[in-house]
Amino acid sequence: IAMDLAIEENCKELHKKVKDIDFLINNAGFGDCGDFTKTDLDKEIAMIHTNIIAYHILTKLYLIDMKKVNRGKILNVASIAGFMPGPLMSTYYATKSYVVRLSESIREELRKENSKVQISILCPGPVNTNFNNVANVKFHMREANSYNVAKFAIDKLLKGKFYIIPG
């Protein structure tokens, strides 16, 4: 199902169309690079919609479903960027921090309820994807192979790990 998840109604429509899932992998997102006062505001608003609001809506709707049957796993793809400030990528780093903090908070709620529903966060460094082209950024460190990161993430998710940090 191809949908623009920056549009809130599409997130809700996706949830209506796709039910009874055991796994939710929230992996939509993009970044942008540049001085905060010079980056494009409309692009940043779209980034916030994709990187925060879509994650929030999908996590909430599917978590409600999963809690009803007391099973399921949610993997929110964040970034190591979620743990630190990010000059020249301020909005992106802030969105990933939101994903980390939301996931940590939900994890604590699930723990207190003794729920069998699991939430985890994948926090990779640079990965060899189209992200760099969209974000107008070039990393000066080796990028991880996307297949290896995905395989690592699924393995750790199935083992019940919360923080999944490749490398």
Q: For the regions a protein language model found, what residue spans apply to each?
A:
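SDR active-site lid
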Residues: 101, 108-167
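Active-site helix of classical SDR
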Residues: 59, 95
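Substrate-binding pocket helix/loop in short-chain dehydrogenase/reductase
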Residues: 35-37, 43-48
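The beta1-alpha1 cofactor-binding region of Rossmann-like NAD(H)/NADP(H)-dependent oxidoreductases
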Residues: 2-13, 41
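Conserved NAD(P)H cofactor-binding loop of Rossmann-fold oxidoreductase domains
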Residues: 27-32
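Active-site loop immediately N-terminal to the catalytic Tyr-X3-Lys motif
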Residues: 86-90
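Residue(s) in the substrate-gating loop at a strand-loop-helix junction
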Residues: 79
